[in-house]
Amino acid sequence: MKKIVSVLLVAVLALAIFAGCSNKQSESLTIAVPNDATNEARALLLLQAKGYIKLKDGAGITATVNDIAENPKNIKFNEVEAAQLPNVLKDVDYAVINSNYAIPANLNPVKDSLLIEDSASSYGNILAVKEGNENTPKIKALKAALESKKVADFINSKYEGAVISVVENPGDGFDATLDYDALKGQEISVAASPTPHAEILAVAKEILAEKGITLKILEFTDYVQPNNVVDSGEVDANYFQHIPYLDDFNAQNGTHIVSVL
């Protein structure tokens, strides 16, 4: 059995509900939601938490529109690929959009949205590696850089609540147990989304550069390929997903995720 291990919870990318521009006359609302298993459930759970719908008992992080037990507002749901949600906003009344897709579309999840997840969300983004690599010097160095105050300050300043740092007691960016001289000249490769993951990693890159370590950031726009290149050994780590997605990926692909936090 292949294994990918989550080694670090860095930030929560808030899920938010944005108003669309549809001019249609209808007694019902149309809301676009992500069509992948974990983010659709995430959207439905947010709508339930805000009182728009009620899900069947037991429906959790795998919920779909078929699990809606009560729909008092007669909402119609359009299931859309997550990356395309900003593009369909003009055709629906509302859309539930992940921050990593909202921000590049010039949508501010804090200022422009009607509803937004809080920092207690269980969908915090993690750094994942292939099992056996979670305690290698390179990964420990990357982990320390991402857990730094410099990264936390960047997240809080840059995204103003759209992305929330969840690292407790951020440090100086360095692991006192590591021999950084031995790491000098080495390269760490990480798969990431363009926004915000690659931007956050760019700050970690500056920290690692102080010790002569190169951080190579490989940008991806889909969720699947980053895990594939980590599993194959082409890339050291993946910083582009949350635990519920990894659990679903595990079920579909025979991988197994073990959190070490």
Question: What are these language model-derived features?
Answer:
Residues 16-20:
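C-terminal motif of bacterial Sec signal peptides marking the signal peptidase cleavage site
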Residues 27-32, 183-195, 213-219:
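Short, well-ordered beta-strand elements
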Residues 29, 52, 72-76, 90-97, ...:
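Alpha-to-beta junction loops
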Residues 41-44, 48, 138, 146-167:
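Periplasmic-binding protein-like
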Residues 59-87, 217-228:
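Short helix-initiation/N-cap motifs at beta->coil->alpha
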Residues 81-82, 90-93, 97-103, 194-195, ...:
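Beta->alpha turn/N-cap motifs
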Residues 89-91, 104-116, 248-260:
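Ligand-binding "clamshell"
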Residues 123-141:
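A bilobed periplasmic-binding-protein/Venus flytrap-type ligand-binding module shared by bacterial periplasmic
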